[in-house]
Regions:
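Loop-helix junctions at membrane interfaces
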Residues: 1-284
């Protein structure tokens, strides 16, 4: 048995991994980090052991910082101390494939440490897709700077199709069947529009790390909105629909952390330090 169904303090039935389930999650994390070695083939050479250690350290530090909460909503969602930035760094350093796998590995670790699973499909979107989207920072990896426009357009298209198809396969039972395709097309448009806005803002900023971070945070926000809309609409404030509630609720904590992080990243001493760390990560 990989999980138990237990009742939490609010009377909700949640899925909690058993010991075997936790072991499997750890194995998955290690496997994903190992797969990063193969995705690095798009670069001039494979990831070295040192670079793989940098990925693991980013996950570990991101996990530690995720527990330093500057603000926490009672119903979920927190403004943490730079935790999303730490998860974005491997993608920015080593490319899109490595970034996505690192983000998913981080999501699995979060599920291992603090699971909050009401539906199996929610596990996919809240832990795998939302945190995996932080790896989209790889669209601005140094190796991709010569093809930024091509990579960003591909990211928008990929994100749109992924959001629409994930909704069709996983969440149509929560929406009227006759309108499920229309809902997912509309959500895909929202996904693509938000990514386009993030990219436009990113091009206005000279710092590539800030661009990468904005794009990655936008990706996480989209999946957080989808989860809130479908699974947590019953928590909506009086007079609010599920989708507007999810849009505002998730924006409050995700973009608040993003704003604090961007301000910190633009400080000259921090920019210099981040450049030195990147050079160290990419050095032979």
């Amino acid at each position: 048995m990989l999980y138990n169904v237990v009742e939490n303090d609010w009377g909700e039935l949640t899925y909690v991994p058993t010991m075997l389930g936790n072991i499997l999650l750890v194995v998955l994390i290690l496997a994903l980090l190992g797969l990063s070695l193969f995705f690095a083939k798009k670069h001039s050479k494979k990831l070295t052991v040192k670079q793989l250690v940098f990925c693991a350290m980013s996950i570990a530090l991101g996990t530690v910082l995720s527990n330093i909460k500057l603000f926490h909503f009672p119903t979920g969602g927190s403004v943490t101390l730079l935790s999303m930035l730490l998860v974005c760094l491997p993608g920015y350093w080593f490319g899109l494939g490595v970034g996505l796998l690192t983000g998913v590995a981080y999501g699995i670790l979060q599920m291992l440490i603090d699971p909050y699973i009401l539906f199996p499909a929610q596990l996919v979107i809240d832990y795998l897709l939302a945190f995996g989207a932080l790896g989209l920072s790889g669209a601005f990896a140094e190796a991709n700077t010569q093809n930024k426009l091509k990579n960003n357009l591909f990211t928008i298209l990929l994100g749109y199709m992924f959001a629409m198809l994930s909704g069709l396969f996983f969440f149509t039972n929560h929406i009227d069947s006759e309108s499920s395709l229309n809902y997912n097309i509309l959500f895909g448009v929202l996904f693509a529009a938000l990514y386009a806005a993030a990219i436009i803002i990113g091009f206005m900023v000279k710092d590539n790390l800030v661009k990468a971070y904005i794009l990655a945070v936008a990706g996480r926000y989209v999946f957080a909105v989808l989860s809130g809309w479908i699974f947590f609409g019953s928590y909506a404030w009086d007079g609010w629909g599920a989708l507007p509630y999810s849009l505002v609720y998730n924006a409050i904590y995700i973009f608040a952390e993003a704003a604090v992080t961007v301000v910190i990243l633009l400080l000259p001493p921090v920019r210099k330090t981040m450049t030195q760390i990147k050079n160290l990560a990419l050095s032979d």
